[in-house]
């Protein structure tokens, strides 16, 4: 979905349409693009807040309510979103409640020279193959394979010590005064319990990708920036000093010891 300033909530969730049949007129719900396995919300912060909030129920409750009726989302449902820098024209800040519902916030910067050269080569190769048959395209991943992978990740072992380390990291964002300056001057609002859940899920996923059946502090530290950077609200003092969320998380990682 391309998010634009004139987008309406019904363009996302769908709407009831009046149909004339032999038995008379009736309303029928026409599903919107949100009813898909993988939803890409492109430039999400170009749309007004009321459209952004249309995603909230679907992302958290896995359902959409239209005209008093509830419609369930598919079992396999994920939302990816891109956003423009807030200083660009025509952008709206995402509400904290919506940001908190995203599992991770991945920062994508400009590629280095070598990677940009590979991008040019890849694009050139793809353009050269367009007139050819699509027989060589990779097969789609069966949904069951994704469900099986999720089940394996759910079985990754998390020790009490690893869990305590995750909780300590989250509590450091909520009670930075326990760690003194400068941390207590930088954080205005810390991570919610969704931050703890995200850290746990992503650490287990990272352990699974690394071929391990248990979570270590290294797994937790490797995902904590992506899990927490969008959940912290920094103080005016931090912003005025040019301190960003990643620097705050780095400071937390250096102060909170792994058991």
Regions found by a protein language model. Give the residues of each.
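Conserved AAA+ ATPase core "coupling" helix
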Residues: 9, 13, 91-151, 157-168
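Short helix-coil transition/hinge motifs at the ends and kinks of transmembrane helices
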Residues: 22-25, 128-132, 176-185
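Short hinge/gating elements
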Residues: 37-41, 84-85, 132, 144-156, ...
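Signal for well-folded cores of large energy- and translation-related assemblies
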Residues: 8, 17, 45, 49-52, ...
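Conserved ASCE/P-loop NTPase catalytic core
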Residues: 1-106, 112, 117
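C-terminal engagement/docking regions of AAA+ P-loop ATPases
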Residues: 174-259
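Non-catalytic, well-ordered alpha-helical scaffold segments
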Residues: 53, 100, 117, 160-167, ...
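Alpha-helix N-cap and coil->helix boundary residues
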Residues: 37, 94, 157, 161, ...
């Amino acid at each position: 979905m391309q998010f634009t300033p004139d987008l309406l909530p019904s363009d996302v969730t769908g709407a009831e349409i009046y149909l004339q049949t032999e038995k008379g007129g009736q309303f029928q719900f026409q599903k919107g693009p949100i009813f898909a396995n993988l939803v890409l919300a492109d430039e999400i912060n170009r749309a007004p807040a009321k459209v952004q909030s249309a995603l909230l129920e679907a992302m958290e409750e896995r359902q959409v309510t239209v005209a008093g009726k509830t419609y369930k989302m598919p079992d396999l449902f994920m939302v990816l979103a891109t956003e423009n820098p807030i200083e660009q024209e025509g952008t709206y800040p995402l509400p904290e409640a919506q940001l908190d519902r995203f599992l991770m916030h991945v920062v994508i910067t400009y590629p280095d020279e070598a990677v940009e050269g590979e991008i040019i080569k890849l694009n050139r190769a793809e353009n050269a193959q367009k007139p050819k048959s699509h027989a060589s395209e990779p097969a789609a991943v069966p949904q069951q394979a994704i469900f099986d992978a999720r089940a394996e990740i759910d079985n990754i072992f998390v020790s009490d010590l690893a869990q305590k380390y995750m909780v300590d990291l989250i509590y450091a964002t909520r009670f930075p005064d326990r760690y003194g300056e400068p941390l207590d001057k930088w954080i205005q609002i810390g991570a919610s319990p969704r931050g703890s859940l995200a850290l746990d899920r992503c650490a287990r996923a990272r352990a699974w990708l690394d071929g391990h059946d248990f979570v270590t502090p290294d797994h937790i530290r490797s995902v904590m920036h992506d899990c927490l950077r969008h959940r912290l609200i920094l103080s005016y003092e931090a912003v005025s000093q040019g301190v960003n969320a990643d620097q705050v998380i780095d400071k937390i990682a250096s102060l909170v010891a792994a058991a």
